[in-house]
Amino acid sequence: VADQYKDKNVGTQVQLATKVQKVLDEYILKLKEKKLQLLEVYLLEELQRLLHKENLITKVTIDKESFEITLHDKDENAIPKDLLSKGEQQMFATGVLLALAKTSGKPLPFMIDTPLARLDVSHRDNMIEKFFPYASHQVVIFSTDSEISEKYYQQLLPYLSRSYAMEYLPGKGKTKQHLGYFWNEKGER
């Protein structure tokens, strides 16, 4: 009798565990779908904020299996990403990073190397005004002196904690850093 009770109890536990696993699988699937929908919304918001062509992209969809991102125009036609200019492609990549960070709900630092190199003036302005100040609690920018002009530096100054310049010393074969950004701390030469 005791063995029958054990067998029945084990069978009940297995059934219960199977049901719990099924519920968890369904929950994970729904959570994944919800996060993907949220990512689509955030990505569209970021692209509309960063791209200077109004209504270039009016909808974003993400495939649930492959996670491939499809951009759509106002007529809901798919826009091949290779038809975007190099600057628009960079803004797309930046938008994806921002949308992922927002979707995670966690503050993530951004480290960006030569962020403005391939951008036209309009996209540069958008990055300076709409991205760098708001991208994260911590944004580290590795740029050249030609990317962040004195004008851009002045615009970013209220958001800067510190800035450093790196100077290569050819005779010594090494690089030294100093406080400031190609100018002194106030952005003056």
Give a label for each model feature:
Residues 125-189:
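C-terminal lobe/lid and adjacent interdomain/linker elements of RecA-like ASCE P-loop ATPase modules
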Residues 63-65, 87, 110-118, 145:
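Active/binding-pocket-proximal capping segment
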Residues 46, 86-111:
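GG-anchored amphipathic helix commonly corresponding to the ABC/SMC/Rad50 NBD signature/C-loop
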Residues 67-73, 163-167:
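Short polybasic amphipathic segments
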Residues 107, 121-127:
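Conserved D-loop/post-Walker B switch-helix segment of ABC ATPase nucleotide-binding domains
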Residues 1-70, 107:
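Extended, charged coiled-coil "arm/hinge" scaffolds of SMC/Rad50-like chromosome-maintenance ATPases
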Residues 32, 36-37, 69-96, 115-121:
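Conserved ABC ATPase signature
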Residues 47, 92, 113, 127, ...:
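Hydrophobic, well-ordered secondary-structure elements that form the walls
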